[in-house]
């Protein structure tokens, strides 16, 4: 999360601080946290969100810590024909329809192209919580997916992104 947002975040579990504030190969054009309507106010803070997600995973997944997954990472190409604001709204609609309406929090960052790369490479990075979030915090239960089901969801998200972008 710190790397994607080019921020400085502290991991409460390890005590380590990750500082990517000076990383500038790809500028962050937009950064935001999207949460379900009934999420607690602290969930809008990137550090609080991911530290809580890690705590929930440790607390509710004691048997399989070594295979615990806190978030799903998704990279998405955006359209260079659109303005930054149009791309942000497009991304926001997709996030709302696919994730926050279903109880998941999303950490979204829009990056510009590399200085020396293709200047049309405007893209977004999404970190989606694996547990739903409500006023009490993260759910003790999370959806378990095998490779086949995850592949089906990825195909669903691709189709949903195509429909949202076409709209």
Question: What do these predicted ranges mean?
Answer:
Residues 1-167:
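N-terminal nicking endonuclease/strand-transfer module with a His-rich metal-binding environment
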């Amino acid at each position: 999360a710190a790397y994607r947002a080019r921020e400085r975040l502290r991991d409460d579990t390890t005590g380590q601080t990750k500082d990517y504030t000076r990383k500038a190969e790809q500028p962050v054009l937009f950064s935001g946290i999207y949460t379900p309507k009934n999420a607690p106010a602290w969930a809008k803070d990137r550090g609080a969100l991911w530290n809580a997600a890690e705590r929930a995973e440790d607390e509710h997944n004691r048997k399989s810590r070594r295979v615990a997954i806190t978030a799903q990472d998704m990279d998405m190409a955006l359209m260079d024909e659109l303005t930054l604001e149009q791309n942000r709204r497009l991304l926001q609609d997709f996030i709302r329809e696919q994730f926050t309406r279903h109880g998941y929090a999303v950490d979204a960052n829009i990056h510009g192209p590399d200085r020396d790369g293709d200047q049309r490479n405007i893209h977004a990075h999404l970190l989606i919580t694996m547990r739903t979030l409500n006023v009490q915090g993260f759910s003790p239960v999370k959806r378990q997916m095998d490779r086949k089901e995850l592949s089906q969801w990825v195909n669903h998200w691709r189709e949903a992104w195509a429909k949202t972008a076409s709209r």
